[in-house]
């Protein structure tokens, strides 16, 4: 080879060497470094691919929260530890949200839920049922003292002895209310019962007849009825007799066997010259029956307060004119006192002054406690024996009267 060509080749080789030195190492060292770079790049790509798979699994809650389900194209290549940690938190958040949803559904009475929630709910339901099963027995136990507080049939002997007086007083109050209960019903409105309404009008008609001392005839009573009510005359006459007993303490009796004429007779056996005479004869007789009965039930004396309380049950009030009895205060404190049927006096040592009523001498002479008790029992469709202590008192009075007559 010519000398000039060899020199040119050597110059080219030197230029190549100088050109390859800044580009990197040569030989086996360079190949080793290239292998390390390839391994590192493959491992980083594997981590990013796993992160992508995890992010795709957690995309559902992100979408529900309004987050975008997709990312940038080169996000996988530049994936870092912070991205992996964030994705781990996202994976935890769905489970947390599920647990929270369980509590919300259980509060909202959702019919479905996770198995654990169902088990816990079933336990709470069983506990609630147990409490409900206990509650009836508790309520029954609680009802026992309530029943024992009101009219318990049993008790200790000491309690019976100490409560005997209060029992007698309670019985007296019950008898008082019983004697006025049916009477109060007669003073109620009668618009819904035409027979009762006709009976009330018949009572007013007979009252006027009696005060004028005119005969009471069946023909006159039939004239007061319209044609459609004439077949009901026996029932109307029966109701009229009941009303007369309740209002005035008198009964309607036939004066002859033909049944064409009637008269009014006192149920208490009072004389016609007494309470059944003069003005307001029937109202006086009715109020007298009420006052004598109350005095008897209250232990042979009744305060003025007790009298007005009793009359109030019948719709009779102090200072108010009654449609049947008129001025009740005048009758019981003046008329009946003057006729000596009742005694109206001030209670001893009462301050402020308090007044009471007692039977008068004329009442003791013309009637008896037994008659009064029988009338009250008849009004209430009962028998005198249903009032044991009153019946015993009335029997004692009968015996004393018989002994006085023998003497």
From Swiss-Prot:
Where are the stretches annotated Disordered? 1-185
Polar residues bias located where?
56-68, 94-109, 133-155
InterPro entries (UniProt xref):
MAGE, MAGE_N, MAGE_WH1, MAGE_WH2, MHD_dom
Biological processes, Gene Ontology terms: negative regulation of transcription by RNA polymerase II
Basic and acidic residues composition bias: residue spans:
123-132
Q: Which Pfam families match?
A: MAGE, MAGE_N
Where does the record place Basic residues bias?
1-16
Tell me which SMART domains the record gives.
Answer: MAGE (SM01373), MAGE_N (SM01392)
Name of the protein this chain belongs to: Melanoma-associated antigen B6B
What organism does the UniProt record list as the source? Homo sapiens (Human)
List the taxonomic lineage.
Eukaryota, Metazoa, Chordata, Craniata, Vertebrata
């Amino acid at each position: 080879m010519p000398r000039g060509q060899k020199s040119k080749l050597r110059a080219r080789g030197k230029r190549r060497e100088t050109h390859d030195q800044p580009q990197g190492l040569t030989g086996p060292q360079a190949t080793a470094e290239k292998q390390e770079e390839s391994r590192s790049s493959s491992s980083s790509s594997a981590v990013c691919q796993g992160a992508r798979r995890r992010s795709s699994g957690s995309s559902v809650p992100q979408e529900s929260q309004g987050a975008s389900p997709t990312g940038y194209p080169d996000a996988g290549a530049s994936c870092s530890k912070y991205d992996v940690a964030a994705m781990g938190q996202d994976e935890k958040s769905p489970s947390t949200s599920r647990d929270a949803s369980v509590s919300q559904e259980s509060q909202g009475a959702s019919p479905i839920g996770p198995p654990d929630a169902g088990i816990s709910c079933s336990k709470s339901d069983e506990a609630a049922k147990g409490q409900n099963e206990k509650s009836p027995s508790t309520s029954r136990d609680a009802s026992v003292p309530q029943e024992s507080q009101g009219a318990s049939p049993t008790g200790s002997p000491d309690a019976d002895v100490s409560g005997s007086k209060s029992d007698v007083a309670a019985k007296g109050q019950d008898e008082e209310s019983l004697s006025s209960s049916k009477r109060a019903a007669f003073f109620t409105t009668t618009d819904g019962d035409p027979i009762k309404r006709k009976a009330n009008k018949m009572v007013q008609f007979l009252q006027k007849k009696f005060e004028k001392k005119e005969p009471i005839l069946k023909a006159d009573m039939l004239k007061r009825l319209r044609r459609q009510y004439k077949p009901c005359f026996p029932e109307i006459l029966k109701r009229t007799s009941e009303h007369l007993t309740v209002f005035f303490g008198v009964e309607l009796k036939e004066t002859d066997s033909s049944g064409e004429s009637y008269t009014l007779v006192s149920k208490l056996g009072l004389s016609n010259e007494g309470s059944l005479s003069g003005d307001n004869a029937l109202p006086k007789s009715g109020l007298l029956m009420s006052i004598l009965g109350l005095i008897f039930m209250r232990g042979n004396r009744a305060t003025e307060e007790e009298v007005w309380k009793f009359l109030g049950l019948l719709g009779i009030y102090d200072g108010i004119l009654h449609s049947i009895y008129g001025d009740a205060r005048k009758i019981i404190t003046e008329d009946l006192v003057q006729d000596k049927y009742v005694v109206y006096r001030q209670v001893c040592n009462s301050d402020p002054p308090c007044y009471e009523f007692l039977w008068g001498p004329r009442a003791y002479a013309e009637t008896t406690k037994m008659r009064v008790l029988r009338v009250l029992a008849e009004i209430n469709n009962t028998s005198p024996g249903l009032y044991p202590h009153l019946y015993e008192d009335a029997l004692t009075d009968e015996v004393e009267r018989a002994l006085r007559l023998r003497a």
